[in-house]
Amino acid sequence: MALLGDLLHVLPSVILLAKLWRTNSCAGISGKSQILYAFVFSAQVLDVYGTSSLGSNPPWMRVSLLLTSYLIVFLIYGPYRKTYDRDQDVLYNEFLVLPCFLLALFAKEGNSSPEAVLLAFAAWLEIVAIVPQLELLCGVQSVDNYVVSYLVSLALYRTIFILNWAVQASEAVALPIIVSFVQILLFVVAFLRVFKLKQTKEKVPYDVVE
């Protein structure tokens, strides 16, 4: 199950890269969400020895996630910037980053080292990193199947994480589990939005692109 979870952790980045390559467009992708994920993966890479449950992926996977996240950000704001939904991706990341930093300082699990605070910050940030993507979904005129597949893969990863925690409950810690449950709730909101697009496309000014 752990191997499946590792593969599902990489899958969202693969899907986004496939979308960028196949469509030559970053439409429907929140650049601000990708920046937040790049911060998350950067912090997790710093956990060199894998001592944190937040950075428990194999080192090669953490490095791969870091590199692909920065590549995606570069492609969105670089070669494909003309297709970027800038007018809809308007949520200020500062409103998400500051509360996460405060939570990392005051709601950490005992360890007060700088590395522990940074990893706790990454965990809280990972909860809300999808929020700019949800905001963008509410404003764009189309949502393609790549974006839907991206959201599904993220939700599947978190579901596998929780199942793996259930199998190894004695080794679990609270923070990653809270991250997973809250993220899944956010993904449910995203799926409800996409479902509404499909069910009411004659009544709203945007559609789901097949």
What are these regions (language model features)?
Residues 1-210:
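Alpha-helical membrane-protein topology signature
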